[in-house]
Amino acid sequence: MERKRGREMNPPSADPPSATPVARANLPGSVAAAFHGRPCSQGTTTLKRVNERYKIVGFISSGTYGRVYKAEGKNGRTGEFAIKKFKPDKEGELQYSGISQSAIREMALCTELAHPNVVHTVEIILEEKCIFIVFEYAEHDLLQIIHHHNQPQRQAIPARTIKSILYQLLQGLVYLHRNWVMHRDLKPANIMVTSAGKVKIGDLGLARLFYKPLQSLFSGDKVVVTIWYRAPELLLGSRHYTPAVDLWAVGCIFAELLSLRPIFKGEEAKMDSKKTVPFQRNQMQKIVEIMGMPSKDRWPLLTAMPEYPQLSSLIAGNAARFARPQGGDGLDRWYNQTLINNQYPAGPGPETPGAEGLALLKQLLEYDPQKRLTAEKALEHRYFTEHGKPSDNCFEDSKIKYPVRRVSQEDNDIRTSSLPGTKRSGLPDDSLMGRPAKRLKEG
């Protein structure tokens, strides 16, 4: 696999002596480059109009940020691209306050990152009041692949495919964490897959630098990670969480690839009018039902969690139901039943996740974030070393033909389309201040 060379940050530690994270102001510096037409680290920036450089094929999706379109290059530019159009933070006849914090953060990080398993940013375009990020195009995402295996009847994703997907996902995550970037929103819809079977981490709108932040991560964004993939420490109100939240999400994604449905599918409690973050009681209950109760012996800092009294109340009200302590057989039963339901072969071998898959899943879904596997350690797990190294093409040897991403032809005017949705929650991020940082390298 061809890799770009450059300077690499030291891996995360308590106080690395010579690390120079991409923090503080290379982020606004990168964004400022977009406004002045200067090149960024990995992509270029321009004031030219989108339609001068790209032919819009159709509309893909919309979200809190704005809209995503599929495009083809023109005027000498070849290939297919995804163009994300950010809506202004507030736009109307009387006021215009710019673009959202998450948009600025994503632009800044995307222009500094370069790894085969992270979506590549081609360029940033400023046009009138809108910002456009042009990405390489991926024909699939994990959510689409999971849905395909559920229709018209349940058909398991091949074990080799799952292993390759996880291996590539973890390689991308190692790179992000080595460079002090926490993704904070890993889920199947944000994991892209190209037609060549290359897995790429996308959507860095909630990503955050975690090396000596100027304020707690909680104060910047009070709600992170989609509810079904949210780690226990986040559910329990941790103010100072770590990249381990991304590994819990990887465990949830692994389980979903196996079972074709979310393993912890809770109902999200919404914030009240005062923007108070509620205890996600139902989601925590879904976790405890399978994983058993977290214990102070296994998780020494459990009682220090802000929402620990709420957890105690939840457990006290369901004492018989949650009788198993962590380390019980709840996850074992779930895993073994999943393999039976989806007709994976019994015994060891490359065609089944096997006992190694269960061992990896347990270490990813560890309650205590300090004991949870890191991305680097996960790559060394015997699940990936038994029966040969995973392929860099998750579709290799697969006879399954996945449908390409659906593109709407009825809404392909990138200039005038309305931009529904609201910005992600969170306060201004003061980690976007300071001196320029050095360019990240691919790891």
UniProtKB/Swiss-Prot annotation:
SMART domains: S_TKc. Its EC number is 2.7.11.22, 2.7.11.23. The keyword Plastid does not apply. ATP binds at I60, S61, S62, G63, T64, Y65, G66, R67, V68, K84. Its cofactor is Mg(2+). Signal peptide: none annotated. It holds the Pfam family Pkinase. One of its GO terms (cellular component) is mediator complex. It is an enzyme of class 2 (transferase). Its main location: nucleus. Residues 1-24, 405-443 are annotated as: Disordered. GO terms for molecular function: ATP binding; cyclin-dependent protein serine/threonine kinase activity; metal ion binding; protein serine kinase activity; RNA polymerase II CTD heptapeptide repeat kinase activity. InterPro entries: CDK (IPR050108), Kinase-like_dom_sf (IPR011009), Prot_kinase_dom (IPR000719), Ser/Thr_kinase_AS (IPR008271). It is found in: Nucleus. Residues 54-384 form the Protein kinase domain. Keywords: Activator, ATP-binding, Kinase, Magnesium, Metal-binding, Nucleotide-binding, Nucleus, Repressor, Serine/threonine-protein kinase, Transcription, Transcription regulation, Transferase. The active site is at D185 (proton acceptor). It catalyses: L-seryl-[protein] + ATP = O-phospho-L-seryl-[protein] + ADP + H(+); L-threonyl-[protein] + ATP = O-phospho-L-threonyl-[protein] + ADP + H(+); [DNA-directed RNA polymerase] + ATP = phospho-[DNA-directed RNA polymerase] + ADP + H(+). The keyword Kinase applies. Belongs to the protein kinase superfamily. CMGC Ser/Thr protein kinase family. CDC2/CDKX subfamily. Component of the srb8-11 complex, a regulatory module of the Mediator complex. Component of the srb8-11 complex. The srb8-11 complex is a regulatory module of the Mediator complex which is itself dependent transcription. The srb8-11 complex may be involved in the transcriptional repression of a subset of genes regulated by Mediator. It may inhibit the association of the Mediator complex with RNA polymerase II to form the holoenzyme complex. The srb8-11 complex phosphorylates the C-terminal domain (CTD) of the largest subunit of RNA polymerase II. This is Serine/threonine-protein kinase SSN3. It comes from Phaeosphaeria nodorum (strain SN15 / ATCC MYA-4574 / FGSC 10173). The lineage of its organism: Eukaryota, Fungi, Dikarya, Ascomycota, Pezizomycotina.
